[in-house]
């Protein structure tokens, strides 16, 4: 019998939970779960995978009080299901009724012949390696510009990163493009971040995305998040990257300028590096700027794969609030559009709020186009007088010029007095600030 732990609801922390996994046309399997740590969505999928080894399940359903099926695809939806179930259990206990198991229904899976079954990975190269056994390495693939094309083919074809080797732990965040998990890579013993994106695309487009992602192995910058690999399972792409224990900047409060300056230096260096490789980031915003307790700052989620960018845009409808005016208007996009996004991001981090007060970002950065028309029609926002240094005010003002060609070029950004002032390599300033902020957050949350 399989035993796991569960305990997100204090009143039920000693209550044994029985989950009844309904198997189509074959009855059911009962799974006993004891109290303890919070049960994750991935844990349930793992158990369903043991019950239905011939199928790939990406979601499951439960029935509400009206008998309607509710789909669970994330940890948040998992919590909602458990909350609903425990409320019914409490009612059953009060009324002296027999406690019924929590019944879940794995979503109908495609027949094996329609699934991607080659190591749970879409190979971008044909040949014998497609059917070879996955290689097990002592560590995750490192980033190096010296990697040959043959090495890249091997990494993409030998299944070095695949679903079977990953154990999902905590949910780090939900974005408009998918869900990010903290995960454990079994062969290497490394902690990594895995972004899982649901995409309704063909096998050919999956292969194209995997091919386009090859360039990430060439990125060798301390200001760019480390890339370990990617794989498809059904209609989910999982992108495996370096784990940053400080998380993304969007979850932090208003930042002091001496910290903001050193973070800005790292972001500008990261963008300059990408631009030198002819890569536009396309999605510069605080949630794509990551920090760790060592004081490092790194960019993530840049648009190296045009097909992936387009597929996400078709799947997750909306317009990014950090887009430059010309992008919102549907005009040509270039480096200067990244520069606008840089400016509005650091203006938000300095103010502790989004610079356009009429735009509320409570539900993330994607929103209907009409709400963002003010970015196109109105003058650029300005920082309040007297609160910030002249170099910082000038830096933001230049980045947020309405005309793209009036914004600084890459070399002008690096030479700007604000960037020069804080380009001292003092990571300790960022490290102390991140550690203090994380400690304050833990103290506010109280004991686990």
UniProtKB/Swiss-Prot annotation:
Cofactor: Mg(2+)
GO molecular function terms attached to this record: ATP binding; MAP kinase kinase activity; metal ion binding; protein kinase activity; protein serine kinase activity; protein serine/threonine kinase activity; protein tyrosine kinase activity
Region span, Interaction with MAP3K2/MAP3K3: 64-68
GO cellular component: spindle
SMART domains found in the cross-reference section: PB1, S_TKc
Catalytic activities: L-seryl-[protein] + ATP = O-phospho-L-seryl-[protein] + ADP + H(+); L-threonyl-[protein] + ATP = O-phospho-L-threonyl-[protein] + ADP + H(+); L-tyrosyl-[protein] + ATP = O-phospho-L-tyrosyl-[protein] + ADP + H(+)
The UniProt record lists the keyword Cytoplasm: no
Biased composition annotated in UniProt, kind: Polar residues: 126-144
Entry EC no(s): 2.7.12.2
Expressing tissues: Expressed in many adult tissues. Abundant in heart and skeletal muscle.
Any GO BP annotation: signal transduction
Record domain PB1: where: 18-109
Active site positions, chain numbering: 283
Annotated positions of the Phosphothreonine modification: 315
Family: Belongs to the protein kinase superfamily. STE Ser/Thr protein kinase family. MAP kinase kinase subfamily.
Domain notes for this protein: Binds MAP3K2/MAP3K3 and MAPK7 via non-overlapping residues of the PB1 domain. This domain also mediates interactions with SQSTM1 and PARD6A.
Biological function: Acts as a scaffold for the formation of a ternary MAP3K2/MAP3K3-MAP3K5-MAPK7 signaling complex. Activation of this pathway appears to play a critical role in protecting cells from stress-induced apoptosis, neuronal survival and cardiac development and angiogenesis. As part of the MAPK/ERK signaling pathway, acts as a negative regulator of apoptosis in cardiomyocytes via promotion of STUB1/CHIP-mediated ubiquitination and degradation of ICER-type isoforms of CREM.
Protein's name in the database: Dual specificity mitogen-activated protein kinase kinase 5
Organism: Homo sapiens (Human)
